[in-house]
């Protein structure tokens, strides 16, 4: 009725992570968890409800505030000299500020009548690393040489919702 745009954030959990290469917007989805299934169901419901939608799939979001990997690593480092971090899951860490800038650019484009912005996008920063590589880089950049980041497997770090191995 008001011609609004539906803006939605989704996740890499809509994929099973079995691919050895990065996923694109056209890659087939195959969620490996209930969480991923719910996110995919949300995407599908939005796309069915209106053509005037923007869905941004993001992954590995981090920032200096809130609950995220960066903050968790800093907190864990304060408690000891060794941190165990998964090394066999690959992805693209995404700075929350950059995602906000992408969102802003899309909203501004839509406000100017750019209807080409509707659809599904993957919104992540460039590059690929493992959680272990990400943690190692964090401590290298802040100069915490005394922190040891030990590589472990996904099986050694179980989670309630299985993460895609490559996203």
Regions found by a protein language model. Name each.
Residues 5, 14-56, 60-61:
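Catalytic helix-loop patch of NAD(P)-dependent Rossmann-fold dehydrogenases
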Residues 44-91, 97-105:
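NAD(P)-dependent short-chain dehydrogenase/reductase
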Residues 1-3, 49, 142:
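Helix C-cap/helix->beta junction micro-motif
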Residues 23, 60, 69, 131-134, ...:
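Tryptophan-centric aromatic hotspots in well-structured domains and transmembrane helices
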Residues 11, 58, 125:
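Short acidic donor-binding/metal-coordinating loop in glycosyltransferase active sites
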Residues 33, 91-94, 129:
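Residue-level signal for the nucleotide or nucleotide-sugar donor/cofactor binding architecture
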Residues 102, 109-160:
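Mid/C-terminal beta-alpha module of Rossmann-like enzyme folds, strongest
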């Amino acid at each position: 009725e008001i011609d609004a745009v539906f803006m939605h954030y989704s996740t890499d959990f809509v994929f099973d992570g079995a691919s050895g290469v990065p996923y694109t917007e056209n890659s087939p989805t195959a969620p490996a968890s209930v969480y991923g299934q719910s996110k995919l169901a949300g995407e599908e419901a939005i796309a069915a409800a209106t053509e005037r939608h923007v869905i941004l799939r993001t992954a590995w979001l981090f920032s200096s505030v809130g609950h995220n990997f960066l903050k968790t690593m800093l907190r864990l480092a304060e408690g000891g000299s060794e941190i165990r971090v998964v090394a066999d899951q690959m992805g693209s860490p995404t700075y929350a500020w950059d995602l906000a800038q992408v969102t802003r650019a899309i909203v501004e484009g839509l406000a100017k009548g750019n209807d080409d912005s509707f659809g599904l996008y993957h919104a992540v920063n460039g590059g690929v690393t493992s959680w272990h590589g990400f943690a190692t880089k964090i401590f290298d950049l802040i100069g915490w040489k005394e922190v040891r980041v030990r590589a472990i497997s996904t099986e050694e770090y179980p989670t309630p919702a299985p993460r895609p191995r490559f996203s």
